[in-house]
Each structure stands twice: as C-alpha cells, then as structure tokens.
Amino acid sequence: MDKLVINGGHRLTGSVAASGSKNSALPLIAATLLCDNGTCRLERIPDLKDTRTFQELLAYLGADISYSGSRLSVSTQNLRAIQAPYELVKKMRASIYVLGPLLARFGRAEVSLPGGCAFGPRPIDLHLMAMEKLGASISIKNGYIEASIAKGRLTGGHIEFPVSSVGATGNALMAASLAEGTTTITNASIEPEITALCDFLMAMGADIKGAGTTALTIEGVPSLHPVAFTNIFDRIEAGTLLAAAAITKGTISITGIDHTHMGAVLKKFKQAGCRITIDDDSLTLQSPDRLEPTDIIASPYPFFPTDMQAQWIALMTQANGSSRIIDKVYHERFNHIPELNRLGAKIEINNNEAIVHGPQLLTGTTVMSTDLRASACLVLAGLVAQGTTEVLRVYHLDRGYEKIEEKLRHLGADIQRENYQEFST
C-alpha cells in the first residue's frame, strides 16, 4: 500500500497543466456502449484508478480498449455481456453509469449495487426511477440491479428529479438517446460534466435540446455513430492546486482550463484575499500574506462544489479568523475533520456545519485518508504543516488525481510516494 510523505513549509510556484476531468471521463466512457459499430476516440482521459477500473469493466463486457497517453479508443460492437459484476463495481460508485447504456442498447442490464467513497448516504433510487420512467422494469436481487424491457426499445417519458443529481441525469440522458419517442427531463443537473456528456452524445447523433439548462428534451434515435471527442479539464483538480498555492502563500499558473467552469470557486479565492489573473485558457493565483476567513455553502453547480469542500476547510485553517462550512449536497461529508484536528487544526462540527478557527499552526504527523477529497485535504494540510506528514491509504487519492505528487513536486513541494505495510489489529 502507498503513502505520501510530505515535508511542509515550501512555497509553491510555477506553472502546471490541468488534467482531463475524472467526473466527465467516466460517463463519456460509459456512453461509448451506445455505439454498435466502429471506434470512439476520447482525448484527454486522465490516467486514474477510476478510469482504469472503468476500462476493465468495459473490457469485461466485451469492448476492445486501447489507451495511450491520454487517448482512449473504445470499440463496443462485439459486446458479449450485460452484467457488471460486483468484483469491478465495488471499486467505484460510478459503475452505475453502465446501467442506462446497456439497457438502451440490449433491453436488459444487470449491475451490482455500487461501491466507491464511504461518506454518507448516496442512494441510486433516482437512477432507477429514471429507467422506470422510460419503460424499464427494475428489481434488486442478490445484490444486483436487474433492469429489463418487455419488448422493443425504451420509450420516451417525463423524468422529474426531486433533487439535482449528476449521475442520474447522465444515466437518463444516455438511456433516452436510444429510446423511442420524446423524453423530457426537468431539474436536470447543469454541471459542466453533464454538458460535456450532452456534447458527446450529440456528436454521436443524439438529438438533445437544452444542454446546460435544467430542462432537457431528447428525441430518441435508432442508433449512434462513433466519433472523436475531447474531454473537458478537471475543475476540481484545478481548484485543489489553487488551494495548494494559497495555503503555502505561493503563486501558480494552471493552463488548459475554462475559467467559466470555476466561477464560484474563484469568487471564494478572491474573497479570501487571493489575486486571480485570467488569460485565455489559463489562470494565475497569487496568495496574500494574510488569508481572510471565508464561509462556503457547498451546493450543486453553479455554486461552490461539494468536491472542493474538504480542501477549503484545510485552507481555512490558515485564515485569520473563523469560517463556516456547510455542505448541502452531502451533509455528512466531514470525515477529514478529525484527521485535520490531529495535525493541529481547530475545527468544530455543529449539526451539519463545520466551524474552522484559524490561523492554526499545523504540525506533521501520520494521518489516514477516508475518501478521495479527504485525501486531497490532508495533502494540503501537509504542505503547510511543520515537519513531516504521512498520508496513508492514498489509493483514495489515486481515484481522482492524476500524478498529483508529481505536479506538486514540480511546483516546489517536498513530497514523495512510498510503500508501507498496513497491519490489521
């Protein structure tokens, strides 16, 4: 098992390129299942544990996969299975994305109940409701979701989500693209990753209106054709790197980004006293000598993202005052706080609100990751802590950050990956 060893106190400077979005790559890869001929070529697919697991899953289903550099080529014309097994699905919740495409293309799908990050309840009921609205019969047997159509194709219907859901919106879009008739989706997610999925599906021949809005209309088509498509940048990775610069009082530039996807995050960095300079497809953050305490409420896009909440808490440990952090997406997403407090942070949890008292002198110790973004939060804390911090179980980090220690080291961090033996008690 791997850990990251960080000697804190180094100011980050320099320039780094943003990776492709993990949260966009996974539904894009799933959408290739909708093509019954030819090869889809996806550019800017990050090399991550989750993207590799998704490639394994498609290969298990019978797809031909080729990955080189950041280009992924997928041919799904010879699929031989409609079951996504527990052995693969347990590794990440996003495996549920294959449900809609398999059901739309073959009329049947069996998907193991998902795994992934362990924080709070994240039900899949909205995915199942969407499939039922398109005419599927759903049952759960022996730990598997079993979905089927009595005959023919899925049929268009009206899907109204009671709450915004990125995953359920993506699954509904993919299934509806091959459904017979018209599907309308209200309260659809407007995250950039969903807009990218719409763009990919439309490039393949899907008829989708309203991309980027909460109201989508999909006219089903008989088939989709393979295309080449470039993934969007990872706004969460970019935000994490900006936080790394801010917490170390550094100055960094990130290239290959679209700043319009980061409006809420950049606004908060500015409120905290950081200077942001935008230039075409890059931006530069210059940290102030004194960070100002800045409250956040994590909510669906276009508001501050829940996937940046943990990193913001780490940053606010160095702010000159107290900050309030509320997560309206995942109310219980505070597993990182006890570990931050072990480093010397002073953070209270009051119901669904975290109160961060800063500035606090953090000192290095051994901490343990509990999920993907908690891992990033602990790395940020390690960058500013005095002495040596060891972050264990960084396999969580590898699910969503491409070569993160290499990027941080390039910017001046003293960070190394080492292997260690974890003993059970």
From Swiss-Prot:
Catalytic activity: phosphoenolpyruvate + UDP-N-acetyl-alpha-D-glucosamine = UDP-N-acetyl-3-O-(1-carboxyvinyl)-alpha-D-glucosamine + phosphate
Active site as annotated: C117
EC number: 2.5.1.7
GO function terms (MF aspect): UDP-N-acetylglucosamine 1-carboxyvinyltransferase activity
Protein name: UDP-N-acetylglucosamine 1-carboxyvinyltransferase
Pathway the protein acts in: Cell wall biogenesis; peptidoglycan biosynthesis
Family: Belongs to the EPSP synthase family. MurA subfamily.
Main location: cytoplasm
Binding site for phosphoenolpyruvate: K22, N23
PTM annotation (2-(S-cysteinyl)pyruvic acid O-phosphothioketal): residues: C117
GO CC annotations, alphabetized: cytoplasm
CDD domains (alphabetical): UdpNAET (cd01555)
Binding site for UDP-N-acetyl-alpha-D-glucosamine: R93, R122, P123, I124, D125, L126, D307, V329
Pfam families to which the protein is assigned, alphabetical: EPSP_synthase
Entry-linked InterPro entries: Enolpyruvate_Tfrase_dom, Enolpyruvate_Tfrase_sf, MurA_subfamily, RNA3'P_cycl/enolpyr_Trfase_a/b, UDP_GlcNAc_COvinyl_MurA
Subcellular localization, as worded in the UniProt entry: Cytoplasm
Species annotation: Prosthecochloris aestuarii (strain DSM 271 / SK 413)
Keywords: Cell cycle, Cell division, Cell shape, Cell wall biogenesis/degradation, Cytoplasm, Peptidoglycan synthesis, Pyruvate, Transferase
GO biological-process terms attached to the record: cell division; cell wall organization; peptidoglycan biosynthetic process; regulation of cell shape; UDP-N-acetylgalactosamine biosynthetic process
Physiological role: Cell wall formation. Adds enolpyruvyl to UDP-N-acetylglucosamine.
Superkingdom of the source species: Bacteria
